């Protein structure tokens, strides 16, 4: 332990493990420690099921009807991967795909007027969908064609829209789209949590809708992927990568002190020994004095013995409840996976409802989601504070990650990773020099 390292990483959450992997691949000497005896930090998957009951202080433990405890891997933070998104690119860049198996999530649904509807995944589905009327569909189709053809480097595709200045509200107006379609587009396709985006320049939204449709085009049923055995596999995959490139891992290792000299990090003290470093990466729990609270998220893990109604018996799906439908500022999300992903006992389903907390009664806020899931065998309620670093780490060289937000995908996490990388390395993280030229997370075989 008494050694010099380029980088010390504290905590084995996904953000920390990806950065540790990338730094190791780039030739840095990395020491990675976690005070917990397991990988994943906030983003771990809990197994066996008995462990989840203990974690939530349910002392009676799981009933026999839950099957074998070790058949369960329950994510604490529910998220899916966008098939064409940044995390999949990072998995390919680092070849971590070889340690993981993915399944396509079977469907994406959106809530409207108390019911759920499938988010159309083909033009035929869009034309047959009950989400909108006939004339609305034609206008929506025109809008989608505009988005598909839009190229920020080719003004001929702009159709009078200025990507840097025209607001998204004005683009919707240009295509004469109604409120329901705007809700659906902004929240189920562009995946915004609130409506703040409406008055921002439209380029970001157009690119988000493009990401959705490109991800969808990849595997057909939905734009989302999910790893077998749960999301806890992701940090472990990147940890293996770091180890292959010479990274040193220590779990169950308490951190006594972060040692600073002249306002700059020089090492970490653990169990009486000091490891020295030039830079430090950590999650907020290791540096409470360097973070501020930026809100709260409620996540309710629900165990079910049935698929969710009106999802065509899907064994995995996402449901988005746009904020306007339930008089809120932020959307409510449901991620559902099941025994088909080796995360639950045979015939069991795990549905996790989550949202950004807006009131003093967070459980009441997610009620519209829970109503869709009834009957629920068991609920586990977690309310987490969201933290963000108070500075960019340039002086202290202590780079702290942000807490995982309420979104159901990893794009915001990847933005944080790229941002930390840029601050540490002084240059942008570049996807283009990916080591592996295969372009498919399933390897060569079609799924």
UniProtKB/Swiss-Prot annotation:
It is found in: Cytoplasm; Golgi apparatus, trans-Golgi network. Changing residue 431 to E: Strongly reduces dissociation of RAB3A from the membrane. Its main location: cytoplasm. GO terms for biological process: negative regulation of axonogenesis; negative regulation of protein targeting to membrane; protein transport; Rab protein signal transduction; vesicle-mediated transport. Transmembrane segments: none annotated. Coiled coil: none annotated. Regulates the GDP/GTP exchange reaction of most Rab proteins by inhibiting the dissociation of GDP from them, and the subsequent binding of GTP to them. Promotes the dissociation of GDP-bound Rab proteins from the membrane and inhibits their activation. Promotes the dissociation of RAB1A, RAB3A, RAB5A and RAB10 from membranes. Interacts with RHOH. Interacts with the non-phosphorylated forms of RAB1A, RAB3A, RAB5A, RAB5B, RAB5C, RAB8A, RAB8B, RAB10, RAB12, RAB35, and RAB43. Interacts with RAB3A. This is Rab GDP dissociation inhibitor alpha. It comes from Bos taurus. The lineage of its organism: Eukaryota, Metazoa, Chordata, Craniata, Vertebrata.
């Amino acid at each position: 332990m008494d050694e010099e390292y380029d980088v010390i990483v504290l905590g084995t959450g996904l953000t920390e493990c990806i950065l540790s992997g990338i730094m190791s691949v780039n030739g840095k000497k990395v020491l990675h420690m976690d005070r917990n005896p397991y990988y994943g930090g906030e983003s771990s998957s809990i197994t066996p099921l008995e462990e989840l009951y203990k974690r939530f202080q349910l002392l009676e433990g799981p009933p026999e009807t839950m099957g074998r405890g070790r058949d369960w891997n329950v994510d604490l933070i529910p998220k899916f991967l966008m098939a064409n998104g940044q995390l999949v690119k990072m998995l390919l860049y680092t070849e971590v795909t070889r340690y993981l198996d993915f399944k396509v999530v079977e469907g994406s649904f959106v809530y409207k007027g108390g019911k759920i509807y499938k988010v159309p995944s083909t033009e035929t589905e869009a034309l047959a969908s009950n989400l909108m009327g006939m004339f609305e569909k034609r206008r929506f189709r025109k809008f989608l064609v505009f988005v598909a053809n839009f190229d920020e480097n080719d003004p001929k595709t702009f159709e009078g829209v200025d990507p840097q200045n025209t607001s998204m509200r004005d683009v919707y107006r240009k295509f004469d789209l109604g409120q329901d379609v705007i809700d659906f587009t902004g929240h189920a396709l562009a995946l915004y949590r609130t409506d703040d985006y409406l008055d921002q320049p439209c380029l970001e939204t157009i690119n988000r809708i493009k990401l959705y449709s490109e991800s969808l085009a990849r595997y057909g049923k939905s734009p989302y992927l999910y790893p077998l055995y749960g999301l806890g596999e992701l940090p472990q995959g990147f940890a293996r990568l770091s180890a292959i490139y010479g990274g040193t891992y220590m779990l169950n290792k308490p951190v006594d002190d972060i040692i600073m000299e002249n306002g700059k990090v020089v090492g970490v003290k653990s169990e009486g020994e000091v490891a020295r470093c030039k830079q430090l990466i950590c999650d907020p729990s290791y540096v409470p004095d360097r973070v501020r609270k930026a809100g709260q998220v409620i996540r309710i893990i629900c165990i079910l013995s049935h698929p969710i109604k009106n999802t065509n018996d899907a064994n995995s799906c996402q449901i988005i409840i746009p904020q306007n439908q339930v008089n809120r500022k932020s959307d409510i999300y449901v991620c559902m996976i099941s025994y088909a992903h080796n995360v639950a006992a045979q015939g069991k389903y795990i549905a996790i409802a989550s949202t950004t907390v807006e009131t003093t009664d967070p459980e009441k806020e997610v009620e519209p989601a829970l109503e869709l899931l009834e009957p629920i065998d068991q609920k586990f309620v977690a309310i987490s504070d969201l933290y963000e670093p108070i500075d960019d780490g340039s002086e202290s060289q202590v780079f702290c990650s942000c807490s995982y937000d309420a979104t159901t995908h990893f794009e915001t996490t990847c933005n944080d990773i790229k941002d930390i990388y840029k601050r540490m390395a002084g240059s942008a993280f570049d996807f283009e020099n990916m080591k592996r030229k295969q372009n498919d997370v399933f390897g060569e075989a079609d799924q």
